[in-house]
C-alpha cells in the first residue's frame, strides 16, 4: 500500500488527539489537547534544539494509539502504534520535516477532541 494513501482518507473520529512535549530537563510533559497546525509546526521546529521528544496520543482508554517523535541525525524519527497506517509498514520511520508535518497535521484534522475522565487526568491547555 502506498505510504501516502492514508493521508487522503477523510474520516472524522470521536477520539481526541493530545500532544505532549518533553524537554530533556523536565520529567513532566507540557500537554496540549487538540493541537492546532501552528502548535504542531512550532513543536517540530523547536524539537531539534529545545525539546527532547513529542508524544501524540488518541483513542479511548481501552485502545489508545500513539505517535512518538524524536529528532536524530537530521531526520524526524516517528514511532507509531496506529491502525491508521498500513500494518505492513514498519512502526518506525525516519522522515523529513515536511513529511513529519504532513503526517501530524493529518492526525490533528482527523481526530476531534472530546475531553472525558480519561483526558481530565492530564494537564490540558
Regions found by a protein language model. Give the residues of each.
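Acidic, proline/glycine-rich low-complexity IDRs
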Residues: 2-125
Amino acid at each position: 500500500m502506498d505510504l501516502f494513501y492514508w493521508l487522503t482518507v477523510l474520516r472524522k473520529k470521536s477520539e481526541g488527539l493530545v500532544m505532549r512535549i518533553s524537554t530533556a530537563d523536565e520529567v513532566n510533559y507540557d500537554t496540549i489537547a487538540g493541537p492546532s497546525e501552528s502548535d504542531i509546526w512550532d513543536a517540530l521546529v523547536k524539537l531539534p534544539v529545545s525539546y527532547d521528544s513529542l508524544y501524540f496520543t488518541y483513542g479511548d482508554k481501552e485502545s489508545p494509539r500513539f505517535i512518538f517523535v524524536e529528532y536524530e541525525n537530521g531526520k524526524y524519527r516517528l514511532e507509531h502504534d496506529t491502525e491508521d497506517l498500513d500494518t505492513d509498514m514498519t512502526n518506525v520511520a525516519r522522515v523529513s520535516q515536511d513529511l513529519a508535518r504532513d503526517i501530524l497535521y493529518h492526525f490533528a484534522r482527523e481526530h476531534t477532541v472530546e475531553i472525558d475522565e480519561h483526558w481530565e487526568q492530564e494537564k490540558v491547555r
